[in-house]
Amino acid sequence: FFDRLLAIKDAYFRDGRFQMQFSLHSTDEEARRRLIPARTWDLRQIAEFGDRFYRKGDRRITLNFAPAEGQPLEPSRLVPLFSPDRFMIKLTPINPTLAAGRSGLTGLIDPADEGSCRAIAEEFEAHGFETLLSIGELRENLIGSNCGMFVAEMTGISR
């Protein structure tokens, strides 16, 4: 799949017209397996593919983190694998969905506390990574439309 995606990107979406993102959520492999209980690449595999995927003129590949309390988040662990010239960081809050509530996760990105958000971003920036704080429309939390999970559960729709 990913080799085909690379061929499509190179053929039709050159020069920054394609955005690739990997959701990592932690810099620790064991924590990632707990947070993402599905078959995933490890950090080294993501880095190796990213190095093959990136071409001069492309957008940087995004490494997305929705960091949670108690989960390792050490930007220094990324440096040996991910070049800041090819990879950037996106920090997002954990949306207050029913699934997030059941998991017991408490997000470190609090949209109401810009100072703490900036502090986390600055840790990545200190290692040379361009870092984007991606805070969505907070009204979505009030009506339960984020990720569609709340609406699906309230209506009995399952995947």
Regions found by a protein language model. Give the residues of each.
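Conserved SAM/AdoMet-binding glycine-rich loop
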Residues: F1-P72, M88-L91
